[in-house]
């Protein structure tokens, strides 16, 4: 979602609360729970859930391995659910031409650096960069080059949904708004 006026451009970023993350967190949780229940059932020697027959599975080595995969999957699933809950990666980019200030804000993982807030002057922006990598896993990333701070990504590095036309359009609009050149690399 974008909000734009003559002097201010605000772009909100979605973060980790994407449909695909919800899908994979659910699938991983249910699958690993199934593995753990089958491993536990093989240890106890009786079916905990009638849908998952486990009397033919010996506890050693199959039940141990399934329990291990179940526990590992639950840890990974809990990590995904935590990133969704904390909405890691969400935030906004705010460009204010009137005051000449750019603010970039992102939510991170809990701790000292949970809030990532970058603030700098517009006159320090050297260019808008587009990185294009084609092939099996195409990548199109929009960066902002800042004097003294290097390059800062403006789009998610795992976002593959931008077509070349969309990324060019976005870069052109932003470069026009900021009055800086565009570089492609």
Swiss-Prot record:
It comes from Hordeum vulgare (Barley). Keywords: Chloroplast, Membrane, Photosynthesis, Plastid, Thylakoid, Transmembrane, Transmembrane helix. It is a multi-pass membrane protein. InterPro entries: PSI_Ycf4_assembly. It comes from the Eukaryota. It is found in: Plastid, Chloroplast thylakoid membrane. Seems to be required for the assembly of the photosystem I complex. Belongs to the Ycf4 family. Pfam families: Ycf4. The chain crosses the membrane at residues 21-43, 63-85. GO terms for biological process: photosynthesis. One of its GO terms (cellular component) is chloroplast thylakoid membrane. This is Photosystem I assembly protein Ycf4.
């Amino acid at each position: 979602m974008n909000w734009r006026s003559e002097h201010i451009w605000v772009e909100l970023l979605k973060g980790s609360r994407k449909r695909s993350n919800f899908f994979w967190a659910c699938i991983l949780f249910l699958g690993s729970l199934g593995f753990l229940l089958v491993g536990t059932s093989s240890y106890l020697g009786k079916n905990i859930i009638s849908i998952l027959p486990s009397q033919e599975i010996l506890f050693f080595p199959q039940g141990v391995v399934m329990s291990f995969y179940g526990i590992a999957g639950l840890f990974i699933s809990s990590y995904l659910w935590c990133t969704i809950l904390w909405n890691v990666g969400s935030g906004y980019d705010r460009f204010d031409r009137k005051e000449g200030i750019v603010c970039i804000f992102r939510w991170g993982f809990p701790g000292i650096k949970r809030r990532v807030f970058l603030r700098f002057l517009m006159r320090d922006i050297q260019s808008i960069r587009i990185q294009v990598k084609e092939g099996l896993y195409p990548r199109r990333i929009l960066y902002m080059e800042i004097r003294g701070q290097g390059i800062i990504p403006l789009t998610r590095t795992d976002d593959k949904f931008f077509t070349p036309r969309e990324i060019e359009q976005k870069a052109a609009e932003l470069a026009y708004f900021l009055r800086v050149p565009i570089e492609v690399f």
